[in-house]
């Protein structure tokens, strides 16, 4: 059917938008599931998805995993499949999974960061763009000047590219503030 991407920096509302879209389809009696990578520790338990604002959605069909393609048959019963924090999944696994299911009539809604704190794109997003029907890029609010923020800046531990954290570790910033303040240690 189709693949939709929701992307942007930290605190731009990607998970919130994913939850909103899935909820709309659930109201239309569609069979929906949300997948999150098992590395994501924002979840209270296996049946609750929570965003950085603390908004929770209880979801009977919520799956945490680190590998997608070997579980593809599990998703036959679902019409709408949401994937949160896609940057944590292996990019080839994610692409094959999304493309296969979309080609078999499923709507896939993928949410993930547009880039790491060095402004390097995540392969999962880059590889999804050519096979997607819809891309939504969200913005946050700059932590310094309160203008629109399109980048994520890491406060410390800058030698570790993938590190799970919240506002204790990452902040959204605009281009100017990224360039002026990217030496925070």
From Swiss-Prot:
<dbReference type="GO" id="GO:0046104">
    <property type="term" value="P:thymidine metabolic process"/>
</dbReference>
<keyword id="KW-0237">DNA synthesis</keyword>
<dbReference type="Pfam" id="PF00265">
    <property type="entry name" value="TK"/>
</dbReference>
<feature type="binding site">
    <location>
        <position position="174"/>
    </location>
    <ligand>
        <name>Zn(2+)</name>
    </ligand>
</feature>
<keyword id="KW-0418">Kinase</keyword>
<feature type="active site" description="Proton acceptor">
    <location>
        <position position="85"/>
    </location>
</feature>
<feature type="binding site">
    <location>
        <position position="117"/>
    </location>
    <ligand>
        <name>substrate</name>
    </ligand>
</feature>
<feature type="binding site">
    <location>
        <position position="177"/>
    </location>
    <ligand>
        <name>Zn(2+)</name>
    </ligand>
</feature>
<dbReference type="GO" id="GO:0071897">
    <property type="term" value="P:DNA biosynthetic process"/>
</dbReference>
<feature type="binding site">
    <location>
        <position position="142"/>
    </location>
    <ligand>
        <name>Zn(2+)</name>
    </ligand>
</feature>
<feature type="binding site">
    <location>
        <begin position="161"/>
        <end position="165"/>
    </location>
    <ligand>
        <name>substrate</name>
    </ligand>
</feature>
<dbReference type="InterPro" id="IPR001267">
    <property type="entry name" value="Thymidine_kinase"/>
</dbReference>
<dbReference type="GO" id="GO:0004797">
    <property type="term" value="F:thymidine kinase activity"/>
</dbReference>
<keyword id="KW-0862">Zinc</keyword>
<dbReference type="GO" id="GO:0046872">
    <property type="term" value="F:metal ion binding"/>
</dbReference>
<keyword id="KW-0808">Transferase</keyword>
<dbReference type="GO" id="GO:0005524">
    <property type="term" value="F:ATP binding"/>
</dbReference>
<keyword id="KW-0547">Nucleotide-binding</keyword>
<keyword id="KW-0479">Metal-binding</keyword>
<dbReference type="InterPro" id="IPR020633">
    <property type="entry name" value="Thymidine_kinase_CS"/>
</dbReference>
<comment type="similarity">
    <text>Belongs to the thymidine kinase family.</text>
</comment>
<keyword id="KW-0067">ATP-binding</keyword>
<feature type="binding site">
    <location>
        <begin position="8"/>
        <end position="15"/>
    </location>
    <ligand>
        <name>ATP</name>
    </ligand>
</feature>
<protein>
    <recommendedName>
        <fullName>Thymidine kinase</fullName>
        <ecNumber>2.7.1.21</ecNumber>
    </recommendedName>
</protein>
<feature type="binding site">
    <location>
        <position position="145"/>
    </location>
    <ligand>
        <name>Zn(2+)</name>
    </ligand>
</feature>
<dbReference type="InterPro" id="IPR027417">
    <property type="entry name" value="P-loop_NTPase"/>
</dbReference>
């Amino acid at each position: 059917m189709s693949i939709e991407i929701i992307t942007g920096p930290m605190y731009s509302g990607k998970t919130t938008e994913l939850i909103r879209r899935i909820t709309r389809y659930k109201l239309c009696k569609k069979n929906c599931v949300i997948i999150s990578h098992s590395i994501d520790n924002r979840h209270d338990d296996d049946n609750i998805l929570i965003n950085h604002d603390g908004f929770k959605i209880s979801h009977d069909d919520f799956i945490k995993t680190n590998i997608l393609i070997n579980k593809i048959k599990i998703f036959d019963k679902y019409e709408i499949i949401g994937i949160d924090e896609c940057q944590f999944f292996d990019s080839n696994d994610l692409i094959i999974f999304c493309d296969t299911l979309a080609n078999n009539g499923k709507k896939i809604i993928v949410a993930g960061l547009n880039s790491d704190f060095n402004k390097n794109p995540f392969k999962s997003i880059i590889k999804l763009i050519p096979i997607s029907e819809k891309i939504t890029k969200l913005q946050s609010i700059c932590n310094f000047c309160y203008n629109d923020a399109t980048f994520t800046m890491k406060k410390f531990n800058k030698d570790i590219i993938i590190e799970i954290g919240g506002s204790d570790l990452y902040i959204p910033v605009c281009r100017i503030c990224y360039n002026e303040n990217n030496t925070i240690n």
